[in-house]
A protein has these predicted regions:
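A compositional/structural signature for long, glycine/proline-rich flexible linkers
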Residues: 1-63, 71-74, 83-87, 112, ...
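Short beta-strand and strand-turn-strand segments in soluble, beta-rich domains
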Residues: 79-80
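A short, structured loop/turn motif at beta-sheet edges
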Residues: 89-96
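Short beta-strand-plus-loop segments that form exposed binding edges in beta-rich domains
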Residues: 102
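Short acidic/polar inter-strand loop motif in beta-rich domains
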Residues: 105-107
Length: 145
């Protein structure tokens, strides 16, 4: 659809990272956009760099698998204000592939009836992730004649 927009493919944001796993996963209740709570386990953290800027994110896990919600510094402008989601892939050697080119907007970006986990504060980045899905175009104001 014309309404979905993506940043150009960015090979530098397709990462393979070492995750510092927590000795015992902590369950945290993640608030959702509809006021519910969904439980996730805090699985581990990883460090990475974007254009030389250090950053760190937490990977969460539930019965559906691994989950990486994040908010970058473009949120509310080029990227969706409530953040984007990613499913990190565990590799055979125990590292994880984190490909920000696959970052997507939560369903609640398109329909407020969906219940979407709200990105925890620990996954709010002070730098831009120019990869993956951009803001949903339908939310933009139409151009003025």
């Amino acid at each position: 659809s014309d309404l979905l927009r993506y940043f150009p493919e960015n090979p530098g944001l397709r990462l393979v990272v070492d995750v510092e796993r927590l000795a015992s996963p902590q369950t945290i209740p993640m608030q959702t956009s509809t006021g519910d709570v969904q439980d996730y386990d805090r699985f581990g953290r990883f460090r990475f760099e974007v254009d030389g800027q250090p950053a760190e994110l937490t990977i969460f896990q539930n019965e559906l698998g691994f989950f990486l919600p994040f908010v970058d510094s473009l949120a509310g402008g080029e990227t969706y204000g409530a953040g984007r989601y990613l499913e990190p892939v565990e590799l055979p050697d125990g590292r994880f592939e984190v490909d920000f080119n696959l970052a997507y907007n939560p369903y609640c970006a398109y329909n407020e009836n969906w219940s979407c986990p709200i990105t925890p504060a620990e996954n709010r980045l002070g730098l831009p992730i120019r990869a993956g899905e951009m803001t949903f175009a339908a939310h933009d104001d139409p151009p003025q004649a």
